[in-house]
Amino acid sequence: MSFSAAPTESFDVIVVGGGHAGCEAAITAARLGLNTALFSLNLDRIAWQPCNPAVGGPAKSQLVHEVDALGGVIGRLADATAIQKRILNASRGPAVWALRAQTDKRLYSRQMLQLLQHTPNLALREAMVTGLETTVAGDQQRISGIRTYFGSVYGADAVILTAGTFLGGRIWVGHQSMAAGRAGEQAAEGLTETLQELGFQTDRLKTGTPARVDRRSIALDQLEEQPSDAADRFFSFDPAAWVSGEQMSCHITRTTAETHQLIRDNLHLTAIYGGVIDSKGPRYCPSIEDKIVRFADKDSHQIFLEPEGRDTPEIYVQGFSTGLPEPIQLQLLRSLPGLEQAVMLRPAYSVDYDYLPATQLKPSLETKRVRGLFSAGQLNGTTGYEEAAAQGLVAGVNAGRLIGGQEPVHFPREGSYIGTMIDDLVSKDLREPYRVLTSRSEYRLILRGDNADRRLTPLGHELGLIDDRRWQLFEDKLQAMEGEKQRLETVRLKVSDPVAPAVEQETGAAIKGSITLADLLRRPGMHAADLVRHGLADADLPLPVREGAEIDIKYSGYLQRQQQQIDQVKRQSQRKLPADLNYAGIGTLSNEAREKLTAIQPSTLGQASRIPGVSKADITALLMWLELQQRERQPLAPTAEAR
């Protein structure tokens, strides 16, 4: 295709879509000095949260920390608009600790719009983008602009598609449907056909969202309350972004036998179980129908009632998405304890939409077919605001580097959850919505949320996304952390000190003469907060500094071993695999990996790692198994008696 009309305007970068991926991409490109435009179907719904009004959770919070460490904005806005915060997996190790924040969805959107409006080099335009303009240079197509529904043409050196669920979007309530990207908003027309004309493969995916209920119609006093427990925790590493607002409670109810029977009796009325659509939905966020069918042995499922904001009565019924008809939805809601008189403000619905399988992308998120065309977010087959925001930042960075004639930034999977996600997306044939999980990373002890700044802020500063003020804060934190670690390694607690008996009682271990505070921290159950409580640490030392020093000391051996493992996997990619290797007998491999490896019989570890269905965790397990076999075959050195 080529221009048939002169461009109305021209930009360096055009971002198509104003969701979480689009906002990060546009702000990133603009901050890199590029003349950028963000096109949205509805500028009043910028960075909307159409499903769960929350940010973070397992692995997702690590992504948010990483985006912030690079200079992105999702963490800052989540901190500014949080109405409840909790630490998940607090009883487990730091590799899986996760901050989760309920956010005020309308305030979040308003603050993002204000941020976009006040970002230099960034223009906002409301329009439906229906076409892509390209030129041909040699055998390579190159993006040259976009076309809108009403015929305007805009020139650009790079275009980033972040269309979410809007391409060919169709929402379903029972067997009734309408064209829409989400409730109340029209679907985008033409862009799917344009991508197909350019040679791209597209497919369909499905997601859904539960009903919203009027808080005033719920007997909250009859339900279990879930208050905030992490008001002093934040996603951003920048203290200037920390906001401690009024916190609100969530509440918990459960499904009943009546709920389950209603669902079983009416499964045929859903679009999926009725055979009307067959798009794949998210495995890790199933509808209530899927839960009842897949977990038929369970008598009850937990349901969370989450406020959508401080100034709205709307309650999000988390864990209760459904594709059933609206009248049955109300019956289902009223079968839940505490919701017998529930008033449903908005029905649940499913949405199926076109997406672009990400194997058609480079790790930079540039498409392989069209130079200068990038894709990010739910359009790539992911699910979640956090996954979208991370991809948006990567696409924004690499669009800028392409225009500047620089090499793209590659995020290796061992360096971040961002890298893990992108590596999975571009190398695996994923046919269901992709959600980041801690289990997807074989390096999760190193890829923690608390050290995301140490892993990525130097890169953010090098790219120009971390300003001098943030860089100075980062250096000050590192200096304070090193100072605290040195203090802990040198200061000793003597058995004669007044606090020693209390410390011995808490840890269940005697102090023999004296012990360094670092060795004290290494004892199970002893934490930096306990040192503060006993007067053995400075209470004024920032929490991130105290906890960072503690984790480095307490888990130093594990961290060193995992880093060695990372280095070993890199070295071992050319390692030969025995032709007669019995993969079925390696219990640490996933079932899918055993099947694929047995069928293909790869000759090297590197070849095995590139087989779809064989995860990086499987490769690590295979490597460890090979090392164990080698040690068992290696003869022991003769003893003195044998000699």
Curated annotation (Swiss-Prot):
Co-factor requirement: FAD
Record keyword Transport present: no
Domain of life: Bacteria
Biological processes, Gene Ontology terms: tRNA methylation; tRNA wobble uridine modification
Keyword tRNA processing: yes
Keywords: Cytoplasm, FAD, Flavoprotein, NAD, tRNA processing
InterPro entries reported for this sequence: FAD/NAD-bd_sf (IPR036188), GIDA_C_N (IPR049312), MnmG (IPR004416), MnmG-rel (IPR002218), MnmG-rel_CS (IPR020595), MnmG_C (IPR026904), MnmG_C_subdom (IPR047001), MnmG_C_subdom_sf (IPR044920)
Localization, UniProt: Cytoplasm
Gene3D superfamilies named in the record: FAD/NAD(P)-binding domain, GidA associated domain, C-terminal subdomain, tRNA uridine 5-carboxymethylaminomethyl modification enzyme MnmG/GidA
Function text: NAD-binding protein involved in the addition of a carboxymethylaminomethyl (cmnm) group at the wobble position (U34) of certain tRNAs, forming tRNA-cmnm(5)s(2)U34.
Subunit structure as annotated in this protein's UniProt entry: Homodimer. Heterotetramer of two MnmE and two MnmG subunits.
Protein name per UniProt: tRNA uridine 5-carboxymethylaminomethyl modification enzyme MnmG
Organism: Synechococcus sp. (strain CC9605)
